[in-house]
A protein has these predicted regions:
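Polybasic/polar functional segments that serve as interface/processing modules
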Residues: 1-120
Length: 120
């Protein structure tokens, strides 16, 4: 479920650092008050990452209660966007990339070049 992303209507990343000692209520408060999103949005996964990027927490409302997910990678880390203090909605493809350890937000956008420095 967590690896393939099946069953999620939307996925949001809480970019930046999150204190992963927080539990369900603390993470739900971040979703509601910091990001102005609804933690009770059924089948929407909210992902959080701390300073150590080898572990993440996920929070999802299943209609009858919250499910708190925790994933720790033994060898490697998640490529977590650290640039903004907001919730970033990601696509299913971006979610797959994140779970594979790939970076989902480009550090430098690709720019159009009108005249390359070399010729063929």
């Amino acid at each position: 479920m967590l690896y393939d992303g099946s069953g999620f209507k939307k996925v949001y990343l809480a970019t930046g650092f999150t204190d992963l000692r927080r539990g369900i209520d603390g993470l739900a408060r971040i979703i509601r008050f910091q990001f102005q999103l609804d933690p009770y949005d059924k089948n929407t996964l909210f992902l959080f990452c701390g300073k150590r990027t080898d572990r993440i927490k996920g929070l999802i409302w299943e209609g009858d209660g919250f499910l708190l997910l925790y994933k720790r990678i033994e060898n490697g880390n998640f490529r977590w966007p650290r640039t903004q203090e907001e919730a970033l909605e990601i696509s299913a493809d971006q979610y797959q990339m994140l779970m594979q350890g790939l970076e989902i937000v480009a550090r430098h956008p690709i720019e159009e070049i009108s005249c390359p420095e070399f010729s063929l």
